[in-house]
C-alpha cells in the first residue's frame, strides 16, 4: 500500500514505512523487545553479494555523505522506518538503496547488543528514581491489566531478550507484502511506486495470501471496578493520575471526543480542569487530560503534579470535574470556543512535509478515509454539545477509574 502527497516546492522527500511490529506484539516476559529490536536495526547491515557489511559508524558516515537521515522506531502499534533525503536523482537513488539495506539486511550483532543492553539497563535504573516513571508504570499496569499496552520494560524483561529473539521478531514483522509506505515530497506517482519497490527489494518477495495470518491481539478489557493506588515516595511534588481505557483510533466518535477532551482538559488554560484545579484553587501549575487511541482502546488520562500535602484536595476537585462533565456535558459557549481554537490551529498540523507525512501515515495505518485531512475542519465544526455529552457518557465511567497517587503527604 503506497500513499503519496506531492510537494514540489522543496527538493526533499520524506518517507515512512510501517509494519505491524509495535510493542503490542511484545511477548509476555519480554517487554521492550520491539523497541530494542528497532534500535538494533540502526546499528549495522550484513554483507550480501558484492555489498560489504557496514557497522554503525560506517552507516553514520554514509548517511552524512548523502545529507540524508534514516531511522527505525517501534511505537505501541507499529514498527516504522523513516527516510529524509534530497530528491536530486543521484542522491535519492543512493539514499533509497542504503535504506533498503537497513530495512532488509540488519546485522543483529550480539557484541553490539551486549554493549547496548548495558546502556538500556543503566537508563532503566536511572528512570526508576523518577517519580513520574514509577507513577506512570503503576498507572499503565492498572489501566491495561494483562494487555500488551500495559507492558513496561524492566531489567528482568531486558535480560530475557536475546539476538535470536530480535531476529525472530523482525522476521515475523518486517514482511514486504504487509508494508504501508507513505511518501511526501518532490516526486510523482510513478517515482513513488519505484521507490516503494526499491525500499522493499531486499526482503523476501512472497504473497501475503501464502503466509500465516498474524495472531490477533486481544482487546483491552474494560475496568470492572475502581482501582486506587497510593505509593509512598519522598519527592517535592506528588504525582496524580486518573483514568481508564478509552477508545480505538477508528472510532466514529473520534472528532466528538477530540472537541470534548479539548474542553475538559486538553485545551490548556481554557480547559475546565485547568480553571477549577489551578485558576480557582491554586492546587497545581498544570492539569491535563488526554486520550491515546490506537488499534486498541488507549488510555484516557488526567495527570497533574501538586504539593504533597495538597494531593488529596487536587484529586477531589479533579474527580468532581470529570464526574460533572460526563454527567452534564459542555456548554454551548465552551463548544464554540473549542471548535474555533481547533479549526484555527489546523494549519499548524500540516505546515511541513514531516507533519504531512505523520498525518498520511496515520490515515494509512488506521484505515481512515482518504479525505480525512480535507474534511477535518468540517467534521470538527459539526460536533455539538449534545454529541459530546452522549459520547463522554458512553466512553467514560468516573466511578470505575484507576487512580494513582505517588508522593502524597497528609
Predicted regions mapped to residue ranges:
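Non-catalytic, conformational "gating/processing" segments within enzyme and secreted inhibitor domains
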Residues: 132, 137, 163-199, 400-401
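A structural supersecondary motif
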Residues: 23, 69, 241-245, 265-306
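M16/insulysin-pitrilysin zinc metalloprotease superfamily fold
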Residues: 3, 44-53, 83-117, 267, ...
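An aromatic/glycine/proline-enriched structural segment found at the starts
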Residues: 146-152, 180-248, 405-410
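C-terminal regions of mature proteins
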Residues: 1, 180-186, 221, 304, ...
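Acidic/histidine-enriched segments that form metal/cofactor-coordinating
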Residues: 58-169, 190, 336-354, 358
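M16/MPP (pitrilysin/insulinase) zinc-metallopeptidase core fold and M16-derived inactive scaffolds
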Residues: 16-83, 148, 152, 268-282
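Short acidic/His-enriched helical or mixed secondary-structure segments at domain edges of catalytic enzymes
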Residues: 119-137, 218-237, 278-284, 295, ...
